[in-house]
Curated annotation (Swiss-Prot):
Compositionally biased spans, kind Low complexity: 626-650
Basic residues bias (residue ranges): 535-548
Protein's UniProt name: FACT complex subunit SSRP1-A
Residue ranges of the region described as Disordered: 434-697
Family to which this protein belongs: Belongs to the SSRP1 family.
Annotated SMART domains: HMG, Rtt106
Keyword Nucleus annotated: yes
Bias type Acidic residues, positions: 461-473, 493-502
GO cellular component: FACT complex; nucleus
Annotated function: Component of the FACT complex, a general chromatin factor that acts to reorganize nucleosomes. The FACT complex is involved in multiple processes that require DNA as a template such as mRNA elongation, DNA replication and DNA repair. During transcription elongation the FACT complex acts as a histone chaperone that both destabilizes and restores nucleosomal structure.
Pfam family, one: SSrecog
Lineage, top ranks: Eukaryota, Metazoa, Ecdysozoa, Nematoda, Chromadorea
Amino acid sequence: MAELQFPGVYVEDVGHLAFGTLKLTEKSLNFKGDKGGKSVNVTGSDIDKLKWQKLGNKPGLRVGLNDGGAHRFGGFKDTDLEKIQSFTSSNWSQSIDQSNLFIKGWNYGQAEVKGKTVEFSWEDKPIFEIPCTNVSNVIANKNEAVLEFHQNDDSKVQLMEMRFHMPIDLENEEDADKVEEFKKAVLAYAGLEAETEQPICLLTDILCTTPRGRYDIKVYPTSIALHGKTYDYKIPIKSINRLFLVPHKDGRHVYFVLSLNPPIRQGQTRYSYLIFEFGKDEEQDLELALTDEQLESSNGNLRRDMTGPIYETISILFKSICNLKITVPGRFLGSSGTPAIQCTHRQNPGLLYPMEKGFLFIHKPAMYIRFEEISSCHFARSDSGTVTRTFDFEIDLKYGGPLTFNAMEKEENNKLFDYLNKKNIKIRNSQRVENTVADSSDDEIDPYKAAVTAEGRQRDDSDDDSTDEDYDLDKDIKKKKEDKESSEGTGSEPDDEYDSGSEQDSSGTGESEPDSEQDVPSKRRKGEPKEKREKKEKREKKEGKKGKKDKDPNAPKRATSAYMQWFLASRNELKEDGDSVADVAKKGGAKWKTMSSDDKKKWEEKAEEDKSRYEKEMKEYRKNGPPSSSSKPSSSKTSKKSSGPSSSKAISKEYISDSDDSDDEEPKKKEKKAAPKEESEESNNGSDGSDESDDSD
């Protein structure tokens, strides 16, 4: 058997059960979290002992390591024990011991530090155990030891502290203090050595943007201590899981970021990231108090005397102590020439860095979004013409709600779009944005000018791309009426203060400019001869008559399928309180699939009967023929002709008349007087719609 895989298994991580998949191979044990959180990799040679014991309310596997640490996995089945035992014995030469927990509920026993865990037991039977790495502090008070624990943001209920009462043995008062010995043993394995020992180096007056302040930093082999004016922090090296080094957008500063798990606390606020800010030209000499063994283990990266820019020396120091790689930006460059994109998140300004394997946002709140956690991305308000200079960038996560970054500069759109395509990240409802003159201009934005420019650009595109056969006159007239109604209905649009009506001047007297109606279409069809334009309009009118036929109300009802017959009869049974129409249809489809052929037979017979009924009625309908109506074509023809020259010409927004004018009919008369040439041409073509409209007036 090459490997074993167990999905749905969970691992204990600082009081939180992180679900994932456990894989056993010939040489190692690997656990990967479902949500990209906790991951465990252990080689077979590092395993000291395996125990089969309960974790929570299900069977679990305790993996003891040679260095005294342990990993606990749960969520197995009782039948998995034989599979794991045969696999570990054949590949790792390890047997599994079954360990039963003492579950009588007694609150007294022996508290001992075994390896890197605190085990509380009674008569050599374990009651519970606590990894020393979960301990944040130990306080000794006479005959009482208090353990304070790190907090995990993923856990809803967290253990804050635990107190052990260790009574003094009156017969052996000269023995060493049990509480003090217990404290030293826990601190040694928890990576919380006392500060009495000499630190590796001391960094003074370092600017920290998160949490805000200036701190003196003492770097120890297993921890770092931050001392500020108000707050002090002590961070174990093992809680640092990522290092980032990114430049600021101004090119003069650099951010050095430490990712922490578990985070540090300041009152009720938790900080999962430490962000240090350094000047790019700032230099400082460091003297490192390192032993020869520590220098050798750093592979030549560290020296006792280090000089250079402070951000470089500190990043190299943390890289060697934490044994982690430093993540730097990839090949992405924004419009500023740096990998930083300026934006806001929840009204807090910051910088977004597209990295090789995720997005880093600095700084409030700082976050790192891995590509594995992203479902899709969306560019919002990126196609709104030339009015806006910014757009919103949304990231949809597989687990959790979307993250929105607002007020990104328009120039970053295409660069970010190409970056996502290279990383094969799904983009929904977006496309590249064409650069326009208005977008690159530094002048003040004129909303009216921008709207007219955008409208003209759309009109030019439609004239160039479309052919005569694709043009539909009725649709064009209907669209212009809708545009007119929408522009009249809203009072907040910038066009309202400029819409004056093509037939009236600003004085409201009803006098119209004679050339105003002729100038707009002549600009659009400048190079087109007049006779050709008239023929084209005739062709457009003929093509405009084509459309979808109206449904005859006398036509027979179509046949219903077997599924619809059953669904309509069973709809009340399927519907429950609060169900929508879609929910009921979904339930019906699922139930229909599970039904047997015998159950469906009844409804299939009904469907056949309905089908034969439809065919019979359809023959009678075709034989008699559909009812004809002579009134509809003439009325439609008259209405089309009455639209006259004004409806066949595209009217810009600046020529749309206001519907609130009291003398709507008077401008129409004066318009016909102002353009007698066009009326004569229409009358020569046999159109008498204008005369009818004049008579009606």
